[in-house]
């Protein structure tokens, strides 16, 4: 009777492998559909931290991140001009 209560280690291993495969397949499908946009790196909302402006600043974008419909946080384009480097003494 006690043997029926113990889960087979093979069953647990199979379930873990199946879960990992499902997550990998669904993630690659989302990326292949062009959903990811580097200008819109996150989500936004009242309870989301950091806010869009803070997230964009942390990722190296200029200040002024905004929340577009669908709760997607988007950033302003980075300047492609020369970077001001302060002189060292």
Swiss-Prot record:
Its main location: secreted. One of its GO terms (cellular component) is extracellular region. It comes from the Eukaryota. Residues 1-30 form the signal peptide. The keyword Disulfide bond applies. This is Defensin-like protein 78. Disulfide bonds join 40-75, 44-67, 52-73, 56-74.
